Amino acid sequence: MNLDFSQCFGDKGDIENITEADIISTVEFDHTGDFLATGDKGGRVVLFERNQSKKKQSCEYKFFTEFQSHDAEFDYLKSLEIEEKINKIKWLKSANDSLCLLSTNDKTIKLWKIQERQIKLVSENNLNGLNHLPSSNIGIESLKLPQLQLHDKLISAQPKKIYANAHAYHINSISVNSDQETYLSADDLRINLWNLGIADQSFNIVDIKPANMEELTEVITSAEFHPLQCNLFMYSSSKGTIKLSDMRSNSLCDSHAKIFEEYLDPSSHNFFTEITSSISDVKFSHDGRYIASRDYMTVKIWDLAMENKPIKTIDVHEHLRERLCDTYENDAIFDKFEVQFGGDNKSVMTGSYNNQFVIYPNAVNTGNDDKPKFKSAFKNSSKRSKKNGFSTRTTDDDDDDDDDDDDEEADDEFDEEVPATKNSPGSQLEDDDEQEEIILQADKSAFKSKKSGQHPMRRRMTSGVGSNLGREFDDVDFKKSILHLSWHPRENSVAIAATNNLYIFSTL
């Protein structure tokens, strides 16, 4: 996979001059990939649409609309200020030309309907201008029939439903069910089930609040519905466990159907492992077979058929293990990184520091076949040369025309199967701990790479000790963290939130 920098939205100023309200707090592609939504700490939602005027084999977006989703409020009963920050955005599938999405801050969820309306005005009449009186020289021959002509297009965003007063604690997750009729919302101690058409009633399906709050040992950190089976959902905890529940078993799903938990040697426990083991995000693969979980140090891939241990553990922040004291002092250890599955259901993506994000191709590798094959989900837009046991891009501008012709022959990015060789990224690795990683940077260096024609990404194999991410840097800038990202559902394009900027990288 060769990802190229495509475009960037937002002010390119220094990080010290950034307004807090402009920092992006969530980013999400819709189900088609034609629209992209971002939410920020100022309570605003900004929508981008695919630029259809560009050539077919490109991934560029343009501004569509912006609206204020949430405002700061004050809870007078608890004497608490409720921030306007957008925690999550989730798209609904639309049956017509309108767009629908859910947005939430710490307490209130809103269902928005975005429509593009055409404004028509009367273009001809029989009045004499400002006096609005019939013209004095009017005759039968000069009478004009009123005509409506298109004057302008107006994009309106209206809150159709407001789901409030159901959470006593901060909402960290919302997830739309595959039936497109219900969704769940999760806070620190409870998960509620909503019907999209009913705003004043929800059902509590998980409640881990103890009778005595002094006995509280864990909180809910993330929750998501299964992408195909509407009765299944999962939620993660600060103890590093993932629980899969079936709503058919009981109205209150406190008894989980499965629990995904890895045994850890008690002798290795310390003050920091209690914090770093907390799961910040969980995602189902698109086919519902696998789960990707992200904690501060690792990404873990779980098979739904195996609960006792993950099928792969990727050490993302191994280079920070000796610096956990520093991360604790500056609160970086509490950063909540997201994780995303690619459209091939095998590759995963997550963020790190220094404005870096990492893609792990074929992180899910079943190796069932004698001659393993991998789906070419990541088509190349340039020639490759073999170097150091894996493929690297050769920057040759003369090949661009040939590459465009090759791209047009492909009907579906996820259909072509390529035989895997020993050194190819899709082959079954001899060492289970080995994993290819692709590192990219979402900052000004992306502009320089695009201008110079150099490829912005670095590719390497990690073995045993995990990721080498950040080893080249003496200093880690903890202020430049990539927490929020989204993967295009049908293409090899990703959207990255870097403080107040939105970066688009694509293979197209």
Curated annotation (Swiss-Prot):
It comes from the Eukaryota. Residues 396-418 have a biased composition (Acidic residues). WD repeats lie at residues 19-58, 81-122, 166-204, 215-255, 274-312, 329-370, 477-507. PROSITE patterns: PR55_1 (PS01024), PR55_2 (PS01025), WD_REPEATS_1 (PS00678). Residues 369-466 are annotated as: Disordered. It holds the Pfam family WD40. Keywords: Cell cycle, Repeat, WD repeat. GO terms for molecular function: protein phosphatase regulator activity. GO terms for cellular component: mitotic spindle; mitotic spindle pole body; protein phosphatase type 2A complex. GO terms for biological process: negative regulation of G2/M transition of mitotic cell cycle; negative regulation of induction of conjugation with cellular fusion; negative regulation of septation initiation signaling. Residues 447-461 have a biased composition (Basic residues). PP2A exists in several trimeric forms, all of which consist of a core composed of a catalytic subunit associated with a 65 kDa (PR65) (Subunit A) and a 55 kDa (PR55) (Subunit B) regulatory subunit. Belongs to the phosphatase 2A regulatory subunit B family. Phosphatase 2A affects a variety of biological processes in the cell such as transcription, cell cycle progression and cellular morphogenesis, and provides an initial identification of critical substrates for this phosphatase. The regulatory subunit may direct the catalytic subunit to distinct, albeit overlapping, subsets of substrates. This is Protein phosphatase PP2A regulatory subunit B. It comes from Candida tropicalis.
